[in-house]
């Protein structure tokens, strides 16, 4: 059993023991397993009637998730001290609980320089414009070949274990959003090599107001004890009036949903689950597919939106598509998945233009087909 597994198990095992440890570590005691409550109540009243309370505010701003010991020394004799042994230096997570596996990711983000032991992609994909901001999808892509596999003693199973963390911080450095996932995998040992040819992809939607932020991401290989982390500027523009257009992304695959549709996840259109292909490399073995969403302006209901997709190579237009748009779905969006009309390897730029009435929206992205 791994350390983080033990921590998670401890959250639910023997709650009375946990209460006792909490009480004693904070200078109190637990009343339990007794019908005689006179003595413990007398002790409580003595403590309430005659005591001094001291508070301690740490001066260090280094929130490294480590345990910091506290020691209280008295100049007078005959006094009894009730105090906790110390505290964990945890940052404010925007009101969200801190999970055991996230502590190691926070330590990676606190390192200088940031660790780079793993190759991964982490992108916040922009989707629906909303009043004051926009909806996004945070996507991680980690090649399975980056992870260390532990084979059991009988060589029957292989264990791989990755953890992901993304923090969104405002200009004051305060955490306003957290996205994380712990993904252990146990697979048959004879299928390991094929499994390592794929990628571990994790995506989660989130909403954010317009502004300038810092996006911090970390990925952990729990079996090897290695990590990688990045920090970047993240700017959210206020929504423009008129028809809207999401970011454009390459599609790794589209799978039929085997669970109820999640209307708040823009990567689940019309009963499918879109797995993005992050980075700028698309395999030439098959024509690449693009995915984006159009958001019609309800005030222009008489005019239907129209989309034009242009492909450029070395500044010259080499292909153009004008797909017919279906009606908007229940969320008011028009998801578009389009097979690019490209065959020759090379570097391409894609430009998407959406028009509805007098309003227009534009988007672009570039990739290598090789």
Predicted regions and their residues:
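Scaffold/interface architecture of coatomer-like assemblies
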Residues: 1-370
């Amino acid at each position: 059993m791994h350390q983080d597994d033990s921590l998670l198990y401890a959250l639910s095992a023997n709650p009375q023991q946990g209460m006792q440890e909490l009480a004693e570590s904070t200078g109190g005691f637990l009343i339990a397993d007794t019908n005689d409550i006179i003595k413990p109540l007398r002790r409580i009243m003595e403590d309430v009637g005659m005591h001094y309370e001291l508070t301690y505010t740490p001066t260090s701003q280094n929130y490294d998730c480590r345990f910091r010991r506290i020691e209280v020394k008295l100049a007078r004799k005959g006094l009894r001290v009730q105090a906790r042994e110390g505290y964990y230096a945890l940052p404010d997570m925007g009101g969200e609980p801190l999970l055991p596996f996230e502590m190691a990711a926070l330590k990676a983000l606190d390192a200088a320089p940031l660790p780079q032991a793993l190759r991964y992609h982490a992108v916040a994909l922009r989707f629906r414009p909303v009043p004051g901001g926009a909806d996004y999808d945070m996507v991680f892509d980690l090649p399975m070949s980056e992870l260390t596999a532990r084979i059991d003693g009988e060589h029957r199973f292989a264990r791989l274990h990755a953890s992901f963390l993304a923090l969104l911080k405002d200009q004051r450095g305060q955490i306003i959003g957290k996205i994380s996932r712990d993904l252990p995998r146990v697979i048959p040992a004879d299928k390991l090599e094929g499994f390592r040819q794929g990628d571990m992809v994790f995506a989660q939607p989130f909403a954010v107001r317009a502004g300038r932020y810092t996006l911090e991401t970390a990925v952990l290989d729990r079996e090897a004890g290695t990590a990688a982390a990045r920090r970047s500027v993240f700017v959210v523009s206020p929504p423009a009036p008129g028809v809207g257009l999401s970011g454009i992304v390459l599609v790794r695959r589209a799978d039929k949903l085997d669970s109820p549709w999640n209307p708040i996840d823009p990567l689940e259109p019309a009963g499918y689950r879109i797995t993005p292909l992050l980075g700028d490399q698309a395999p030439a073995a098959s024509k690449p597919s693009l995915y984006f969403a159009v958001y019609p302006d309800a005030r222009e209901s008489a005019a239907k939106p129209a989309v034009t997709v242009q492909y450029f190579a070395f500044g010259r237009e080499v292909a153009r598509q004008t797909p017919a748009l279906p009606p908007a779905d229940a969320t008011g969006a028009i998801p578009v998945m389009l097979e690019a009309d490209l065959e020759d390897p090379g570097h391409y730029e894609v430009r998407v233009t959406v028009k509805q009435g007098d309003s227009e929206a534009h988007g672009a992205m570039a990739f290598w087909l090789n």
